[in-house]
Amino acid sequence: MKPSIVAKLEALHERHEEVQALLGDAGIIADQDRFRALSREYAQLSDVSRCFTDWQQVQDDIETAQMMLDDPEMREMAQEELREAKEKSEQLEQQLQVLLLPKDPDDERNAFLEVRAGTGGDEAALFAGDLFRMYSRYAEARRWRVEIMSMSEGEHGGYKEIIAKISGDGVYGRLKFESGGHRVQRVPATESQGRIHTSACTVAVMPELPEAELPDINPADLRIDTFRSSGAGGQHVNTTDSSIRITHLPTGIVVECQDERSQHKNKAKALSVLGARIHAAETAKRQQAEASTRRNLLGSGDRSDRNRTYNFPQGRVTDHRINLTLYRLDETMEGKLDMLIEPIVQEHQADLLAALSEQE
């Protein structure tokens, strides 16, 4: 391992021990904000510190085994120990490199999930419903909370658009690679000839920002309309003009919220989604500029991004970004998404490591 990396790891290990000592200080325990901040830092440094301690121990083992090579009686055993220690050292070095990768500050945050029906009419709306159910099942398995912010139902089921807030540990970091185009190939229930149709939906995942970090929005840049919402088939969701539509004039971003009976609550929800959308648009623009020379696995939520194809007749799901195909569609639609999410997270880490090596 490079001396510069070892020096960085030593500094992080020392900081971990320093923070541990500070957390036992009565003055810091009394200051809850400081105590919480240090507790978070301690948790973030723990894996690096533990892994580095293991690596240091293995270096000692390598040194001891090399010294034993000079003893004819111990040589065979020393060679075996040396081989095992070097293998372990390589594994730990790879782990440490991943742990040193720059962290996305948004990864630990809650997220807004938007699913929109694209091309394909009623079938696209039905598939949007299937996708939302898939994500809800995944959230349920991870003990995350799903709160619907706004929805527009399809005429024959599913959704034209649905927005939900998902709350829990590391939601955005886990779901952020879902942003982009999702395509379905299947025989619609209304198809009498048994022909396979292709429909599409777009998914956008955005971090929920604390109030202090929301972009400054000039009230003069907003057009706010109130209306009475009604569900599919004319069923009234509510019977007062409490539904809110906010248009951000400079960007053209439109957010509707009609889930609550209170206009005030709908407006607050719509503004939080609007802030997240503006932030996401700014972030995507910045990332596009930064990553223009290498691929960006993080979809923009634009329909031109083709993330996955879900082929029902073949029971196949394909992630086009990493050329991964699995014949486990039923499990996928039931929310077993880790088998698709984990490979793309690993690919993203590999890209970051490659970029880091180029810089060095």
Curated annotation (Swiss-Prot):
It comes from Salmonella paratyphi A (strain AKU_12601). Methylated by PrmC. Methylation increases the termination efficiency of RF1. Residues 285-313 are annotated as: Disordered. One of its GO terms (cellular component) is cytoplasm. It is found in: Cytoplasm. The lineage of its organism: Bacteria, Pseudomonadati, Pseudomonadota, Gammaproteobacteria, Enterobacterales. This is Peptide chain release factor 1. Its main location: cytoplasm. InterPro entries: PCRF, Pep_chain_release_fac_I, Pep_chain_release_fac_I_sf, Prokaryotic/Mito_RF, RF-1. The modification N5-methylglutamine is found at residue 235. GO terms for molecular function: translation release factor activity, codon specific. Peptide chain release factor 1 directs the termination of translation in response to the peptide chain termination codons UAG and UAA. The gene is prfA. Belongs to the prokaryotic/mitochondrial release factor family. It comes from the Bacteria. Keywords: Cytoplasm, Methylation, Protein biosynthesis. Pfam families: PCRF, RF-1.
